[in-house]
């Protein structure tokens, strides 16, 4: 979820700062509303220090960060963080990054970042000890079943697998059975498999057959062998649409975490709107990023 914007300057003047602007928005939009429920979750703007840095594969960086003081607030699976890019005057807008994992024992927040634009490439240069100003937790996350024993299929592709790790952990702690179905072009694209294994069974597809079954996630044999109580997915839109269509065909409720381009992260700039089935447009950053797919216009 990256969004680049041209930098506006006036000769002889300082670069306009959006920090005060975003702080004001934070106060105005702390109440997050969704169609069926209203969730009050306090938002924070604070510096987090990088405690560990890992490179899961070329072009990706895993930052494990912790508050300089205090403890991490409650964070729901599927929510995201807006990071201020340091020392990068051409990227004054924050970058939205999905929450990969929350380790409350170590007081760490994990963010898996794909370095594809100026902002994320700068973030990929961060080192242990660096501090990043973060606004979090933002958006609405995945639905946790109200009763235990539910079997939930978590389908991810590419960097879209990132939020499913924390969701899987949360499901397991809630007494549910998470089952992971992860897809990539090659086996190299599949990251954090050892972490996923701690929380549930893993099934894999690759387009070149280098790992798991060959093909797309919707071609995997597990979909015909087992029944699931619900499905949650995150990844490239074509993949999520295919998963949503499969779920609809077998009568299983499905949620998707959208990765629309975002800027403010609070529903003010309207650059991340998504058309709903009823014709209305909703801000992905505020009303989502997780939506029940039967509310989206995908299946029309």
Each model region followed by its residue ranges:
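Acidic/polar hotspots within intrinsically disordered regions
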Residues: 2-4, 19
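Short, surface-exposed secondary-structure boundary micro-motifs
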Residues: 86-88, 137, 277
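FNR/FR-type flavoprotein reductase catalytic core
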Residues: 118-263
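Cationic, amphipathic, low-complexity segments that mediate targeting or membrane/lipid association
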Residues: 7-13
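Ferredoxin-reductase
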Residues: 42-128
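Local cysteine-cluster metal-coordination motifs and their immediate loop/turn environment
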Residues: 237, 259-289
């Amino acid at each position: 979820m990256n969004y680049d914007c041209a930098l506006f300057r006036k000769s002889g003047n300082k670069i306009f700062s959006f920090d005060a602007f975003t702080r004001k928005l934070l106060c105005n939009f702390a109440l997050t509303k969704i169609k069926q429920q209203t969730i009050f979750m306090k938002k924070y703007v604070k510096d987090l220090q990088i405690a560990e840095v890992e490179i899961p594969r070329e072009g990706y960086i895993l930052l494990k960060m912790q508050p300089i003081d205090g403890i991490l607030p409650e964070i729901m699976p599927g929510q995201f963080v807006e990071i201020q890019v340091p020392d990068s005057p051409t990227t004054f807008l924050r970058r939205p990054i999905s929450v990969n994992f929350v380790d409350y024992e170590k007081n760490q927040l994990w963010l898996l970042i794909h370095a594809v634009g100026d902002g994320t490439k700068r973030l990929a240069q961060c080192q242990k000890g660096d501090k990043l100003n973060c606004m979090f937790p933002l958006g609405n996350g995945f639905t946790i079943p109200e009763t235990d024993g539910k079997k939930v299929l978590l389908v991810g592709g590419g960097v879209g697998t990132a939020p499913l790790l924390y969701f899987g952990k949360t499901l397991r702690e809630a007494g549910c059975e998470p089952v992971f179905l992860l897809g990539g072009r090659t086996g190299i694209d599949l990251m954090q498999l050892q972490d996923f294994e701690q929380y549930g069974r893993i099934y894999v597809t690759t387009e070149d057959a280098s790992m798991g079954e060959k093909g797309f996630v919707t071609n995997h044999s597990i979909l015909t062998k087992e029944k699931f109580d619900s499905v949650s997915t995150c990844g490239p839109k074509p993949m999520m649409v295919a998963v949503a269509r499969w779920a609809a065909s077998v009568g299983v409720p499905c949620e998707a975490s959208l990765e629309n381009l975002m800027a403010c992260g609070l529903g003010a700039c309207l650059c991340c709107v998504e058309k709903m089935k009823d014709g209305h447009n909703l801000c992905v950053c505020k009303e989502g990023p997780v939506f029940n797919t039967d509310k989206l216009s995908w299946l029309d």
